[in-house]
Protein backbone atom coordinates (compact mmCIF):
# COMPACT_ATOMS: atom_id res chain seq x y z
CA UNK A 1 0.00 0.00 0.00
CA UNK A 2 1.42 3.36 -1.04
CA UNK A 3 2.07 5.98 1.62
CA UNK A 4 1.82 9.71 1.01
CA UNK A 5 4.04 12.13 2.93
CA UNK A 6 4.73 15.88 2.69
CA UNK A 7 8.10 16.22 4.46
CA UNK A 8 11.30 14.31 3.74
CA UNK A 9 12.13 14.35 7.46
CA UNK A 10 9.06 12.15 8.08
CA UNK A 11 10.11 9.24 5.84
CA UNK A 12 10.25 6.08 7.98
CA UNK A 13 13.27 3.79 7.85
CA UNK A 14 11.44 1.09 5.90
CA UNK A 15 10.99 3.52 2.99
CA UNK A 16 14.54 4.89 3.05
CA UNK A 17 17.38 3.53 0.95
CA UNK A 18 15.30 3.16 -2.17
CA UNK A 19 15.05 4.49 -5.69
CA UNK A 20 13.72 8.03 -6.06
CA UNK A 21 12.00 9.34 -9.19
CA UNK A 22 11.91 13.15 -9.07
CA UNK A 23 9.69 15.51 -11.03
CA UNK A 24 6.59 17.64 -10.87
CA UNK A 25 4.64 14.77 -12.39
CA UNK A 26 1.78 17.10 -13.23
CA UNK A 27 -0.54 15.02 -15.33
CA UNK A 28 1.46 11.79 -14.95
CA UNK A 29 1.60 11.49 -18.73
CA UNK A 30 3.72 9.18 -20.87
CA UNK A 31 6.98 11.01 -20.13
CA UNK A 32 6.33 10.95 -16.40
CA UNK A 33 5.44 7.27 -16.53
CA UNK A 34 8.76 6.61 -18.30
CA UNK A 35 10.68 8.27 -15.44
CA UNK A 36 8.73 6.40 -12.77
CA UNK A 37 8.93 3.16 -14.78
CA UNK A 38 12.71 3.42 -15.08
CA UNK A 39 12.96 4.03 -11.34
CA UNK A 40 10.61 1.10 -10.71
CA UNK A 41 12.84 -1.25 -12.70
CA UNK A 42 15.82 -0.31 -10.50
CA UNK A 43 13.73 -0.71 -7.35
CA UNK A 44 12.38 -4.14 -8.31
CA UNK A 45 15.80 -5.38 -9.44
CA UNK A 46 17.36 -4.45 -6.11
CA UNK A 47 14.39 -5.13 -3.83
CA UNK A 48 14.18 -1.59 -2.45
CA UNK A 49 11.28 0.88 -2.12
CA UNK A 50 10.19 3.12 -4.99
CA UNK A 51 9.62 6.77 -4.11
CA UNK A 52 8.04 9.30 -6.47
CA UNK A 53 9.03 12.77 -5.29
CA UNK A 54 7.02 15.75 -6.42
CA UNK A 55 6.47 19.32 -5.25
CA UNK A 56 3.20 20.67 -3.89
CA UNK A 57 2.09 23.21 -4.74
CA UNK A 58 3.66 23.29 -8.18
CA UNK A 59 6.67 25.67 -8.08
CA UNK A 60 5.02 27.91 -10.67
CA UNK A 61 2.49 28.94 -8.02
CA UNK A 62 5.34 30.51 -6.04
CA UNK A 63 7.40 31.86 -8.93
CA UNK A 64 4.56 33.07 -11.18
CA UNK A 65 1.75 34.00 -8.75
CA UNK A 66 0.13 36.45 -11.18
CA UNK A 67 -0.69 33.65 -13.60
CA UNK A 68 -3.58 31.25 -13.18
CA UNK A 69 -2.66 28.22 -11.06
CA UNK A 70 -0.94 25.63 -13.20
CA UNK A 71 -2.42 22.24 -12.39
CA UNK A 72 -3.17 19.50 -14.87
CA UNK A 73 -4.08 16.97 -12.20
CA UNK A 74 -5.48 17.67 -8.72
CA UNK A 75 -3.36 16.30 -5.89
CA UNK A 76 -5.71 13.45 -4.93
CA UNK A 77 -5.95 12.26 -8.55
CA UNK A 78 -2.16 12.41 -8.86
CA UNK A 79 -1.80 10.27 -5.72
CA UNK A 80 -4.21 7.69 -7.15
CA UNK A 81 -2.22 7.60 -10.41
CA UNK A 82 1.01 7.10 -8.44
CA UNK A 83 -0.50 4.17 -6.56
CA UNK A 84 -1.38 2.62 -9.92
CA UNK A 85 2.31 2.78 -10.88
CA UNK A 86 3.36 0.61 -7.91
CA UNK A 87 4.96 3.51 -6.06
CA UNK A 88 5.68 2.71 -2.39
CA UNK A 89 5.98 6.33 -1.27
CA UNK A 90 4.55 9.42 -2.91
CA UNK A 91 6.59 12.22 -1.36
CA UNK A 92 4.84 15.48 -2.25
CA UNK A 93 7.29 17.94 -0.74
CA UNK A 94 5.77 21.15 0.57
CA UNK A 95 7.09 23.80 -1.83
CA UNK A 96 7.29 27.26 -0.29
CA UNK A 97 9.76 30.17 -0.22
CA UNK A 98 11.93 28.43 2.39
CA UNK A 99 12.16 25.24 0.34
CA UNK A 100 12.78 27.24 -2.86
CA UNK A 101 15.76 28.92 -1.15
CA UNK A 102 17.61 25.59 -0.75
CA UNK A 103 20.68 25.41 -2.91
CA UNK A 104 20.93 22.46 -5.26
CA UNK A 105 23.76 21.07 -3.13
CA UNK A 106 21.65 21.38 0.04
CA UNK A 107 18.78 19.59 -1.68
CA UNK A 108 21.04 16.70 -2.63
CA UNK A 109 22.64 16.43 0.81
CA UNK A 110 19.63 17.14 3.05
CA UNK A 111 16.81 15.54 1.06
CA UNK A 112 18.35 12.79 -1.08
CA UNK A 113 21.33 11.67 1.01
CA UNK A 114 20.44 12.38 4.65
CA UNK A 115 16.63 12.33 4.46
CA UNK A 116 15.89 9.55 1.97
CA UNK A 117 19.23 7.74 1.93
CA UNK A 118 18.61 7.33 -1.80
CA UNK A 119 20.27 4.37 -3.47
CA UNK A 120 19.43 5.58 -6.97
CA UNK A 121 17.84 8.75 -8.40
CA UNK A 122 15.96 9.02 -11.71
CA UNK A 123 14.90 12.26 -13.41
CA UNK A 124 13.62 13.35 -16.78
CA UNK A 125 15.71 15.04 -19.43
CA UNK A 126 14.76 18.57 -18.37
CA UNK A 127 14.73 18.38 -14.57
CA UNK A 128 16.32 21.33 -12.76
CA UNK A 129 16.23 22.08 -9.06
CA UNK A 130 17.58 24.22 -6.25
CA UNK A 131 17.74 27.95 -5.76
CA UNK A 132 17.83 29.68 -9.12
CA UNK A 133 17.34 26.31 -10.85
CA UNK A 134 21.10 25.80 -10.42
CA UNK A 135 20.94 22.01 -10.12
CA UNK A 136 20.78 19.80 -13.19
CA UNK A 137 21.74 16.33 -14.39
CA UNK A 138 25.43 17.22 -14.30
CA UNK A 139 25.26 18.18 -10.63
CA UNK A 140 23.25 15.05 -9.80
CA UNK A 141 25.74 12.87 -11.67
CA UNK A 142 28.69 14.40 -9.77
CA UNK A 143 26.84 14.22 -6.46
CA UNK A 144 25.92 10.60 -7.09
CA UNK A 145 29.57 9.70 -7.52
CA UNK A 146 30.57 11.56 -4.37
CA UNK A 147 27.68 10.39 -2.16
CA UNK A 148 27.47 6.83 -3.45
CA UNK A 149 24.05 6.72 -5.10
CA UNK A 150 23.28 5.93 -8.72
CA UNK A 151 21.78 8.39 -11.17
CA UNK A 152 19.81 7.96 -14.39
CA UNK A 153 18.49 10.71 -16.63
CA UNK A 154 15.64 9.49 -18.83
CA UNK A 155 15.90 11.02 -22.34
CA UNK A 156 13.05 12.93 -23.93
CA UNK A 157 10.31 10.77 -25.40
CA UNK A 158 9.31 11.74 -28.91
CA UNK A 159 5.81 11.35 -30.20
CA UNK A 160 6.35 9.18 -33.25
CA UNK A 161 4.08 6.23 -32.67
CA UNK A 162 0.90 7.46 -34.35
CA UNK A 163 -0.62 9.11 -31.29
CA UNK A 164 -2.27 12.50 -31.61
CA UNK A 165 0.06 15.45 -31.98
CA UNK A 166 2.81 16.27 -34.40
CA UNK A 167 5.40 13.62 -35.15
CA UNK A 168 8.58 14.40 -33.25
CA UNK A 169 6.86 16.45 -30.52
CA UNK A 170 8.51 15.91 -27.15
CA UNK A 171 6.52 14.65 -24.21
CA UNK A 172 7.54 16.74 -21.22
CA UNK A 173 8.95 14.42 -18.58
CA UNK A 174 9.07 16.51 -15.44
CA UNK A 175 7.59 19.93 -16.00
Annotate each language-model stretch with its function.
Residues 1-175:
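Nucleotidyltransferase catalytic core that binds NTPs
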Amino acid sequence: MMRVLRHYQDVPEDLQGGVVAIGNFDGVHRGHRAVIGEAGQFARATGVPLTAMSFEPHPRVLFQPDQAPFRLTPFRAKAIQMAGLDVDLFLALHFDAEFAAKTAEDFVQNVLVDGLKARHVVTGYDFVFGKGRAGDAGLLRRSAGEAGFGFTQVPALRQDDGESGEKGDIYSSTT
